[in-house]
Each structure stands twice: as C-alpha cells, then as structure tokens.
C-alpha cells in the first residue's frame, strides 16, 4: 500500500556486506561444482507498468508489467497475465505486521512495534533477522509457487519512521539485503521499495526500484543509480498531476504514472 535484534554479531556483519546470501543460497554441489542459478527477471528502464492493489485486477490495461497483491491473487491470475505476455510482480509487506493476512498469528509479539498509520498494521523489529527470515521466506515461497516473476517487498525504510524500535541505517541495510537474498534464492527479481536514502548502497542488491512520490519530495535524482545500471525505476505520484513530473522523469528514464492513493485500476501514465 502507499506509504512513505536479536542476532549474533557475526551474522549481522555478514548481512551488512553487499551481495549477502543466507545459508539457503545455492552453493557447490557434492561434486564441488557450483550449481547453475537462473538470473532473476530484471525490468529495463522505461518498462510500462500497472500497479493495482485494490479490487479485481483489470487485465485489459496495456502495460508490460503488473504489480499486484500476492495474497489476494491466485496462480490462475498470474498465469492469465503471463498468457497475455505480461510479467507479474508479487506485492507483500516485508517491514510490517498485518492482522488481516493469513499468516498473522505466526509473528510473535516481540517483533511488533507501533502502528504504521494503516489499519491493522504495525512496524516490525527488523533487527530480529532470525525470527523474520523464515516468516518472510514463506511469503516469498507463496509468490514463487504462484508463478510471480518478482517481489515488491513493502516498507523497507522503517529506520526513517517512528517504529517503536531504535532502528539504525545499518539495521535497515542488513534487513533489506536479507530480503533481496530471499527473493533471489527463489529465482525471483526483487524491488527496492522507497528507501531512497540508501539507494547507492543497495542498487547492486536489487533488480529494480518501486518509488512513491519522488517528484513530490524532490528525491528523484537519488534513484538514478538504478537507471544507470540498466534497472527500471517504477514510479508513481498521487497528488501531482502528470504535467508536474513527467518531463523530469522521462529524462531520467523512469516508468512514471499518476495513480489514485488506494491503487485501484485507474492510471495515467507519462
């Protein structure tokens, strides 16, 4: 939706290193040869897209990529979009607990913080990597099993918000790199959602960016490391009309559009 640890030291230091991969990452097989890994899907700058999290997915929208709710949509919806030549992104929250999701009871009270401003949601203590990794892994399993091409993990910028936990920039880097590794282990691409301040640190770990309102907050230039690396920036504005941002974001190579705040099917692309 739109919105602006207890771990041993050695594990935390490993996570802070670029290119972190968890113990489940592919490695040498029993013969000592490295296992072949299919490169994750990576949208190119300028790719057209649709982002719909509210209501039944309107599959008639002319866009190369659809970003839709991973829980609310079935494998049949993903397959139908694939049959139309679309790539499909699985929206899930990574940084918040949601009381309306089927796995809500699996999250212990110790990781739940303050409300993030949305009904039924609370920030997560992203320092607790050992607790959150298997929970998020199961969500990403769902995305993979439904056939999604990539994941949009929401709320990867908790350290800049009032979460109820003393989160640091280093905590966020460690968590975000873990999230990226979980997607890659499952053969899916992964988006850096917002977290503009850490773009330069994370561009090598993520396959594309999803951003809300960089024009509104004069932050779009900070996202150019993605387009310079040949990776799409999928961008929306809510309050600004297209005439206020399209000229700028076209020059930057972004995939920009105006959307309603509830992210229904309506869109006005640049």
Task: Report residues per predicted region.
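Secretory targeting and sorting signals
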Residues: 1-26
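Glycan-processing catalytic domains of CAZymes
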Residues: 4, 9, 29-270
């Amino acid at each position: 939706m739109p919105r602006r640890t207890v771990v041993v030291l050695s594990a935390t230091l490993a996570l802070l290193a670029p290119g972190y991969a968890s113990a489940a990452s592919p490695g040498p097989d029993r013969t000592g040869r490295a296992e072949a890994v299919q490169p994750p899907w990576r949208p190119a700058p300028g790719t057209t897209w649709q982002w719909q999290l509210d209501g039944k997915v309107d599959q008639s929208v002319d866009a190369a990529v659809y970003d839709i709710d991973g829980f609310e949509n079935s494998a049949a919806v993903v397959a139908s979009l694939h049959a139309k030549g679309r790539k499909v992104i699985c929206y899930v929250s990574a940084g918040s607990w949601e009381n309306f999701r089927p796995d809500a009871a699996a999250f212990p009270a110790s990781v739940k913080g303050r409300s993030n401003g949305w009904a039924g949601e609370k920030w997560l203590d992203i320092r607790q990597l050992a607790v959150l990794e298997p929970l998020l892994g199961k969500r990403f399993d769902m995305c993979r099993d439904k056939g999604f091409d990539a994941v949009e993990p929401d709320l990867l910028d908790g350290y800049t918000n009032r979460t109820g936990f003393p989160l640091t920039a280093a905590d966020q880097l460690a968590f975000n790199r873990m999230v990226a590794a979980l997607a890659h282990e499952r053969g899916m691409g992964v988006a850096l959602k917002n977290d503009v301040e850490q773009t330069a640190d994370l561009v090598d770990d993520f396959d594309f960016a999803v951003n809300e309102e960089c024009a509104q907050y004069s932050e779009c230039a900070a996202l150019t490391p993605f387009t310079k690396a040949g990776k799409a920036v999928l961008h929306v504005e809510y309050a600004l009309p297209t005439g206020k941002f399209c000229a700028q974001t076209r020059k930057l190579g972004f995939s920009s559009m105006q959307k309603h705040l509830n992210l229904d099917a309506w869109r006005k692309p640049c």
